[in-house]
Amino acid sequence: MAVLGSLLLLILAATLSVAVAYDPLDPNGNITIKWDVMSWTPDGYVAMVTINNYQTYRQIMAPGWTVGWTWARQEVIWSMVGAQATDQGDCSRFKANLPHCCRRTPAVVDLLPGVPYNQQIANCCRGGVLPAYGQAPSAAAAAFQVSVGQAGTTNRTVRLPRNFTLLGPGPGYTCGRARVVPSTVFLTADRRRKTQALMTWNVTCTYSQHLASKYPSCCVSFSSFYNDTIVPCAKCACGCDAHKPCVRSERDGKRLAVTGKKHDANANAHGRGNGVAAAAMAAPLLQCTTHMCPVRVHWHVKLNYREYWRAKITIVNFNYRMNYTGWTLVAQHPNLDNITEVFSFDYKPVVSYGSINDTAMFYGLKYFNDQLMEAGPHGNVQSEVLMRKDARTFTFRQGWAFPRKVYFNGDECQMPPPDSYPYLPNAAPPAAASLVGSAVAMAALVFFLMA
């Protein structure tokens, strides 16, 4: 019985370790790292490495991705184009030309925009930023070229790197083993000739919010026209001990944020950008709130028409040290399959399972509100969504008008307790409630959102 119990525990642990990186709204989302060997050299090979973000609504923000691995033997990196290793390592055994990196476990980062053209290749040099595939599929890829030495020089003698890691930019990603796949076929610029990689292997990395952080990074609050109750984010929704100290006044927040940026610049200038001090200064600097979340999403049921209803979405940033560029918001609600119009946000449906269309991805309009500014008077973006009613399912009762799940930048937000949702008064039908309660609810909502 003891052996059987141990076996069951092992199976359960394995199941949980797989399930923890599974996102039911994006079941096939992953980041794939592809190595294409383009040519052999006297002591190794030249490979084109491509990082494809196949996650529908999770991006990699600045300071960008970091890819690492362990060489199987004593390989070195002679040179790179479009990226660089962060540490050269000990190359003292080489007497003449020194390799770009001699570490057995190199860590590679993207180059910054504006580097000389002879250091660039296609899809490089964006500071490691990768947009979500559902948001910008043509830009959701990065690439660099690496020349590997002291390695195999044929398909039979090459040993694949192992123990791949991916930071995006923080933890949360788990990478599988490198696997040889059919060689990539390329089409020439005139589209009249095909060429083929000499060898190709793939590495698949999946994200787990539970590995990335102990606490959520966002929370959700609710309000409605038919009830003057505003349901706030749950107390300590993002961990009250995780973000200490916090800032009580906007003036202090701005002052500390500027001080942090100057300290960070000085640390980088003196080569201490990766030190403990710099890491501490990069930590979130949050406004003091009861929920202590960097981001709050507010869903307000605003208006009720005969055939339509309208909801207002407001995203508020409480972090004085973070701008969210290219942000994404995902909401799950059964009426999102009948969206008629979205005001001041872009919108795409997220269809994960056949014909089920109950999930929508929202993101900002380019050069208008695609950047959620740091905490303060400009640290919010908002939009309204107009939806056509389905007479078979539509109701304001039992919290039906509020979303089931909300994600910000790919991370699931903490929802309020279901028993706290604004209820529909029994004494008045929805139309009457709309007229009686709108003014009171809107006044309270404005005060709440500005707090």
Swiss-Prot record:
Belongs to the COBRA family. The keyword Transmembrane does not apply. A lipid is attached at residue 426 (GPI-anchor amidated asparagine). Residues 1-21 form the signal peptide. The keyword Aminoacyl-tRNA synthetase does not apply. Glycans are attached at residues 30, 155, 163, 202, 227, 323, 338, 357. It is found in: Cell membrane. Pfam families: COB_C, COBRA. This is COBRA-like protein 6. GO terms for biological process: cellulose microfibril organization; plant-type cell wall cellulose biosynthetic process. It comes from the Eukaryota. GO terms for cellular component: plasma membrane; side of membrane. Keywords: Cell membrane, Glycoprotein, GPI-anchor, Lipoprotein, Membrane, Signal. It is a lipid-anchor; GPI-anchor. InterPro entries: COB_C, COBRA_pln. It comes from Oryza sativa subsp. japonica. Its main location: membrane. Residues 427-451 form a propeptide. The lineage of its organism: Eukaryota, Viridiplantae, Streptophyta, Embryophyta, Tracheophyta. Involved in determining the orientation of cell expansion, probably by playing an important role in cellulose deposition. May act by recruiting cellulose synthesizing complexes to discrete positions on the cell surface.
